[in-house]
Each structure stands twice: as C-alpha cells, then as structure tokens.
Amino acid sequence: MKKIAFFVICVGFPSLIFASASIQESDFIQRVINFVIFVAILWYFAFDSIKGIFVNRRNAISARLQEVQENLHKAKREKETAQKRLEESKEKAKNIVNAAKQEAYLLEQKYNDQIKKDIETLKYALESNIEFERRKITHEAVDELLNKLIQSDDVQLNKEDYVNIITKRIS
C-alpha cells in the first residue's frame, strides 16, 4: 500500500505543481488511468514469467552456492584425510627409522661377537702354530746335533748315552 501511495505522489504531485493550466483542461487523469491499466495488464500477464525468471535465477544461484559449499566440504575432508595420511606416514617413517637403528645395532653386536670369536680363534691358531714351529725347530736342532755327533769320530758315546739322548729327544 505504501508503494502505491508513494508512486501516486511521485507521479501526480509534480504534475499538479508545475502545470500551467487547470486540471480540467488536461487529459492527465485519463493518462494516469491508462498507465495504471497498462501496469495492471502487464502485471497480470508478465508477473508469472518475471517471477519465474527471478525464482529460476534464485534457484540457480542457490544450486551454485550449494555446489560450492559441497566442494568446500569435500576439499576440507580431503585435506583432513591428507593430513591424517601425512601423520600416519610420519609415524611409519619414525617406526622404520627406529627399526633400522635397532637392526643396525643388532647386526653390529652380532658382527662384533663374530669378530671377537674369529680373533680368539686366530690367536689360538697362531699360538698353536708358534708352539708347533718351536717344537719343530727344537727337534730339527736335536736331529742335526745327533747326526753330527753320530757322524763325528771325535766324540765317543756309549749306548747308555745314546739311550739317554733319544729319550730326552722323544720327550
């Protein structure tokens, strides 16, 4: 109602103030009535289509807004999923690094133990070899000395001396 009154005031008031002749000599009222009839006919025939256009536009905008909001929610869910996967990957990486460190420590211990055993074995073998070589050199020296004594005519030994030397050599 306020809109209609405002419209009548806006259209009619300037015409009344600025008119130079009386209202009876003009066709203003007929023109206003024709304009009102024109607006009413236009309203009657075009209102539904104009309203439909605006409703369709509003629905299209609403649909686009809904689609954008769905895309936004989808992006947020994907971001959260990616964050979770990133955290899981970091945790797996930490676990892998810890497992690798532990495995390296165990391998180091294993190889250190094996190296110690190998060193002990080599040490024992070396000591045995040294002892064997010492005995071998001693036996060779005794054999050489006995051969010289037996072959030389300077030294005269009796059988008891030979038996004594041989028993010492054997032991």
From Swiss-Prot:
It holds the Pfam family ATP-synt_B. One of its GO terms (molecular function) is proton-transporting ATP synthase activity, rotational mechanism. InterPro entries: ATP_synth_b/b'su_bac/chlpt, ATP_synthase_B_chain. Its main location: membrane. Keywords: ATP synthesis, Cell inner membrane, Cell membrane, CF(0), Hydrogen ion transport, Ion transport, Membrane, Transmembrane, Transmembrane helix, Transport. CDD domains: ATP-synt_Fo_b. The chain crosses the membrane at residues 4-24. GO terms for cellular component: plasma membrane; proton-transporting ATP synthase complex. It is found in: Cell inner membrane. The keyword rRNA processing does not apply. It is a single-pass membrane protein. Belongs to the ATPase B chain family. NCBIfam families: PRK08475.1. F-type ATPases have 2 components, F(1) - the catalytic core - and F(0) - the membrane proton channel. F(1) has five subunits: alpha(3), beta(3), gamma(1), delta(1), epsilon(1). F(0) has three main subunits: a(1), b(2) and c(10-14). The alpha and beta chains form an alternating ring which encloses part of the gamma chain. F(1) is attached to F(0) by a central stalk formed by the gamma and epsilon chains, while a peripheral stalk is formed by the delta and b chains. F(1)F(0) ATP synthase produces ATP from ADP in the presence of a proton or sodium gradient. F-type ATPases consist of two structural domains, F(1) containing the extramembraneous catalytic core and F(0) containing the membrane proton channel, linked together by a central stalk and a peripheral stalk. During catalysis, ATP synthesis in the catalytic domain of F(1) is coupled via a rotary mechanism of the central stalk subunits to proton translocation. This is ATP synthase subunit b. The lineage of its organism: Bacteria, Pseudomonadati, Campylobacterota, Epsilonproteobacteria, Campylobacterales.
